[in-house]
Amino acid sequence: MFRGANAISLDAKGRLAMPSRYRDELISRSSGQLIITIDAVDPCLCVYPLDEWELIETKLRALPSLREENRRLQRLLIGNAVDLELDGSGRFLVPPRLREYAKLDKRAMLVGQLNKFQLWDEDAWDAVSAADLAAIQQPGAMPDELRDLIL
């Protein structure tokens, strides 16, 4: 499971180093093979270990293809998915087109989301985090299914 927000840097070629605390799990689970694609909701990228991505593909494949909403989601997620592999230094290259989508420059945030990571531009992450915190603190903003969650 992947947790926490990690400040990272992209080099001039668009490579980033996976934080060392995640590398062993990624190597044992998927031999360091990753899939990166766009997030269809937020202006960031999603990075999946290959085994997790294969579960997503199975679910996407099972969606009825006659529904435009399903085809749209399949096009966005699968059409933008790129196979990656951690190199010997634990780095991977974020393709230019995906860097442009997420507006990634030098400073970024790699955010653990249990089964995947989100990769954000640092300023965008700071802004969405502040907005999320403000929104959830509003009276009545907590959904019913979260009210019973003990943190």
From Swiss-Prot:
One of its GO terms (biological process) is negative regulation of DNA-templated transcription initiation. Its main location: cytoplasm. One of its GO terms (molecular function) is transcription cis-regulatory region binding. Keywords: Cytoplasm, DNA-binding, Repeat, Transcription, Transcription regulation. It is found in: Cytoplasm, Nucleoid. Residues 5-52, 81-124 form the SpoVT-AbrB domain. InterPro entries: MraZ (IPR003444), MraZ_C (IPR035644), MraZ_dom (IPR020603), MraZ_N (IPR035642), MraZ_sf (IPR038619), SpoVT-AbrB_dom (IPR007159), SpoVT-AbrB_sf (IPR037914). The keyword RNA-binding does not apply. CDD domains: MraZ_C (cd16321), MraZ_N (cd16320). One of its GO terms (cellular component) is nucleoid. Pfam families: MraZ. Belongs to the MraZ family. HAMAP family: MraZ. Forms oligomers. This is Transcriptional regulator MraZ. It comes from Pseudomonas fluorescens (strain SBW25).
